[in-house]
Structures are given as C-alpha cells and as structure tokens.
Amino acid sequence: MAAAAAVRAGVNFTQRLNRISPVCRVCPLLRLNRCTGAAVRRAVDGFSAPSRRLRTSIGVCQSEDSSAPEEDAHAQEHIVNVVYIDRSGRRIPVQARVGDNVLYLAHKHGIDLEGACEASLACSTCHVYVSSGHYDRLPEPEEREDDMLDMAPLLQENSRLGCQIILTPELDGMELTLPKVTRNFYVDGHVPKPH
C-alpha cells in the first residue's frame, strides 16, 4: 500500500511539473531550475516524499548461457532438496535454494499447504511433520510458534509450522509430511485459496 502511494505521489509530481513548463523538453528535475514563480512553489509545496520505511529488494539477473563451471558449482552449493509428502501419501521432490521459506516453496510448486495467515504466526494451517533426522537441525521454535502449534490438530513431537522453516544447507534431503487435516475458521463457507 505504501508503494502504491509513493507511485501515485510521483505521478502527481510529474504531472505538476508538466503543467509548470510544458514547452521545456529537458529532464523533469531540471524544469524546476528553469521555471520560476508561484506555479513552481505550488507544485513543490504539494509534493510529499514517500515513506522512508518503504522496503525494497535487489534482484540479480543472470544470462541463460552462463557457461562458467565455477558459477555452476557455486550455484549447486546453494541447492536444497526437499520432499513434500501430501495428504494422499504422494511424494513430491522439490529443489529449492538456501533461504527459501517452506510455505512459499510449497505454494510455488502447487502443493496444498494452506498458510491462511500469510506467515504472520496467526494460524496453524501450514502445520507439517519434519523428518526425524532433520528436526533437530532446525532452530528451536519461538514461543509464538509453539502457541500456534498448540491449536493444530494431530500435533506430534516433530510438528512445526512451515512458514517458520527457512532452508539451510543442513536441511538437504528433508521430508515434510502434511497432516491429514488442518484447522481454519471460515466465514459463510468461504474457503481461501493459498496466497
């Protein structure tokens, strides 16, 4: 929502600049230096800077013909193999990257792990059973996660919330079993889709 407001503010500022000096064809930032008078003051006074709390991310683009073998070896170091076992017992192997979230990874691969609260620790619909060899490699659950797990049906000693599992190289080969049922509260029969 903050990003949309920042974009709207930027568009409005650009429109105001165009009204100041429509003849000027130089960079909009230079138009302020060339134009004078009350019109400039009104345009600048009406502008509000976007929030500094706006979160951004940096993406890295790679070409498809990356032929450097050391890059391929480096990329392989960051691959984590995970197997989801769905409610019918079907095994779904997935290759993931270090740092991936188990809940979002399931959504990306069409696995029916609900996550109704979008990883905000407000439900237990992303409840999974972690394979015994990998459960001890996970960090201890926080108190909030334990509180949500207390509401999960069919709780076991190896139960965790998928939204709180971040993949590390030590978790390579981990198996995550989806419980037969989850508990979510629906209003008027509405069943939300995974996000």
Curated annotation (Swiss-Prot):
Biological processes per GO annotation: [2Fe-2S] cluster assembly; [4Fe-4S] cluster assembly; electron transport chain; P450-containing electron transport chain; ubiquinone biosynthetic process
GO molecular function (one): electron transfer activity
Binding annotation for [2Fe-2S] cluster: 117, 123, 126, 163
Domain 2Fe-2S ferredoxin-type as annotated: residue spans: 81-182
Cofactor list: [2Fe-2S] cluster
Keywords: 2Fe-2S, Electron transport, Iron, Iron-sulfur, Metal-binding, Mitochondrion, Transit peptide, Transport
Range annotated as the organelle transit peptide: 1-61
Gene3D superfamilies according to UniProt: 3.10.20.30
Any one GO cellular component localisation term in the record: mitochondrion
Chief site of localization: mitochondrion
Entry annotated with the keyword Transferase: no
Matches recorded under Pfam families: Fer2
Note on cofactor: Binds 1 [2Fe-2S] cluster.
Compartments reported by the entry: Mitochondrion; Mitochondrion matrix
Known role: Electron donor, of the core iron-sulfur cluster (ISC) assembly complex, that acts to reduce the persulfide into sulfide during [2Fe-2S] clusters assembly on the scaffolding protein ISCU. The core iron-sulfur cluster (ISC) assembly complex is involved in the de novo synthesis of a [2Fe-2S] cluster, the first step of the mitochondrial iron-sulfur protein biogenesis. This process is initiated by the cysteine desulfurase complex (NFS1:LYRM4:NDUFAB1) that produces persulfide which is delivered on the scaffold protein ISCU in a FXN-dependent manner.
Family per record: Belongs to the adrenodoxin/putidaredoxin family.
Subunit structure: Component of the mitochondrial core iron-sulfur cluster (ISC) complex composed of NFS1, LYRM4, NDUFAB1, ISCU, FXN, and FDX2; this complex is a heterohexamer containing two copies of each monomer. Form a heterodimer complex with NFS1.
Protein name: Ferredoxin-2, mitochondrial
Lineage summary: Eukaryota, Metazoa, Chordata, Craniata, Vertebrata
Gene assigned in the entry: fdx2
